[in-house]
């Protein structure tokens, strides 16, 4: 079989075609810490095998976010928060996308709980209670119960490569109007609507067990949220100084001429039209925080 990565539509995905590698043991350089990774692939309808990549609906996002190390504040990667419902709730397509991700989650959990996988991981007592946070879809909860009417969110990471201390973002970003590539870092904290192709990459097994979901490609429609000017301002008239040449002809020199003027092709931030974000969403939910603190002394 040849390696052939294809986009698998949610309606066409068959979880029985999801393939898992044997656990690979890896270690973090210069530390005694090791972990296991189970790579995920997919058998396409033509029999070829490639990465498992599914498309999202057109979703609202708060833009590219930096992931930082809590101790050093160093940037360790990037992610995109995706709001999975529109302002009116969930459309049929959005519900189907959520159901597709959760069917993949369930298939991965079933694989982890097989005797052969537990033996390979040397986690013989692993059970479903150890996988409570395995689902990457975040839902706001109050006293342990899901808050009704709040959109679930997904926080997929960008695909990056690290070499010699440098980090490069490999995820593709494309402008929906022009079709031109966009620099990912120009989208930091920029509100936008976007359609992504998500790579269901692997299962990470370390201190925690999590499903690794990455953004393979992202088509972006930026939302203009700046203020617009309401008062008209008359431009100053251009004064022309008449200079007599040796031939008796007159030349005009425009004062204040700026060769670098863009003729309004690029708007200043103050001149941007105010556009209501579409869809309107609740403020970005906080990511689940780890409980901590000092223990009470007896």
Where are each of the predicted segments found?
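Extended serine/threonine-enriched, polar tracts that run as long, contiguous segments within proteins
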Residues: 139-223
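Compositionally biased, intrinsically disordered low-complexity regions
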Residues: 49-52, 65, 79, 146, ...
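Extended acidic low-complexity intrinsically disordered regions
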Residues: 232-235, 249, 261, 290-298
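OB-fold ssDNA-binding interfaces and closely related basic DNA-contact patches used
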Residues: 2-164
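Acidic, serine/threonine-rich low-complexity intrinsically disordered regions
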Residues: 276-291, 298
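Long, highly charged low-complexity segments enriched in Glu/Asp and Lys/Arg with interspersed Ser/Thr
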Residues: 206-256
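Acidic, Ser/Thr-interspersed intrinsically disordered low-complexity regions
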Residues: 240-281
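Hydrophobic transmembrane signal anchors and adjacent membrane-proximal interface regions, especially
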Residues: 5-7, 35-40, 99, 126, ...
């Amino acid at each position: 079989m040849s390696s052939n990565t294809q986009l698998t539509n949610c309606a066409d995905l068959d979880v029985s075609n999801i393939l898992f590698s044997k656990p690979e043991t890896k270690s973090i350089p210069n530390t005694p810490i090791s972990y296991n990774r189970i790579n995920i692939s997919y058998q396409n309808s033509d029999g070829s095998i490639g990465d498992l990549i599914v498309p999202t609906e057109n979703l609202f996002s708060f833009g590219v976010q930096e992931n930082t190390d809590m101790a050093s504040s160093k940037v360790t990667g990037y992610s995109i928060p995706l709001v999975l419902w529109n302002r009116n709730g969930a459309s049929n397509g959005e519900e189907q996308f959520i159901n597709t991700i959760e069917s993949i989650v369930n298939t991965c959990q079933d694989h982890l709980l097989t005797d052969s996988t537990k033996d390979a991981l040397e986690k013989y007592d692993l059970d479903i209670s150890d996988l409570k946070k395995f689902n990457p879809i975040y839902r706001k909860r109050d006293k342990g119960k899901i808050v009704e009417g709040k959109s679930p969110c997904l926080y997929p990471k960008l695909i990056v490569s690290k070499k010699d201390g440098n980090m490069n973002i490999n995820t593709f970003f494309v402008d929906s109007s022009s079709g031109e590539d966009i620099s990912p870092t120009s989208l930091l904290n920029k509100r936008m609507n976007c359609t992504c192709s998500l790579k269901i990459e692997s299962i990470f097994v370390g201190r925690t067990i999590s499903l690794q979901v990455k953004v393979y490609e992202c088509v972006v429609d930026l939302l203009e949220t700046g203020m617009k000017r309401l008062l008209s301002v008359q431009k100053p008239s251009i004064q022309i100084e008449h200079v007599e040449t040796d031939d008796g002809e007159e030349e005009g020199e425009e004062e204040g001429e700026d060769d670098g003027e863009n003729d309004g092709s690029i708007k200043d931030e103050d001149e941007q039209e105010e556009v209501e974000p579409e869809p309107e969403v609740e403020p970005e939910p906080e990511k689940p925080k780890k409980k901590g603190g000092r223990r009470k002394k007896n």
